[in-house]
Amino acid sequence: MQDYNLGPDGYLDLIEGAKASVDIPVIASLNGVSPGGWAEYARLMEEAGADAIELNIYSIATEPTVSAVELEKGYVDLVRQIKRTVRVPVAVKLSPFFSAPANIALRLDDVGAGGLVLFNRFYQPDFDVESLEVVPRLTLSHPDELLLRLHWAAILTDHVEADLAITGGVHSATDVVKCILAGASVTMMASVLLQKGVQHAFSVLTDLRRWLEEHEYDSVRQMCGSMSRRSVPNPTAFERGNYMRVLSSYPLRAGHFNR
């Protein structure tokens, strides 16, 4: 992980080197909270060659005096400031923990966010019960995490102009298909590439092309959003009213509770 922790100047060099080495767009990730310094660093990323910037706002409100209104205003102000500083597209990596995700998504869309990334994965500390220390724990994503992202992509795609990206739980071509059907224009994967190697991406693309042919789609654009909340016959599948249907779908064995 030493190569990963490059520092600010090293990261700018990495962006410049990547831009010179590849023919695909280079999207730089910016971790920030306060508008001033981070907006300036966004400008330096653009100068280094970044084709777009993903703003990863990792803010944990540990102070009980900080209200949800203040926190959300900080997000919106930060995106507005960075949009005024750079000309390249800016995407925002969202947390799933907003009380009204659709509202904050719409507000970020209104101030110019070109993309919304669903969702950030916050790494939680663990307790070492022998040393009584708080220790970091890195856990790679699992396909089960995809369901929350599909849920909100299917809702948000009908309400925002920004492109949607899904990250967290994308491991296979089937996962990619689900993301696109929900309304995502972009799917991201990292954990499975760390586990299986970069060559796994080529297998996913091959399987995706096969699926498109078998289901007679000419392109991914044709299917994008075809299972959004507005597009499906039963929109309540994305709402609280679907709760009992989900529970009743679980197959209970005879005598399951008679023990």
Where do the language-model regions lie?
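Short glycine/proline- and acidic residue-enriched helix-loop micro-motifs
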Residues: 1-2
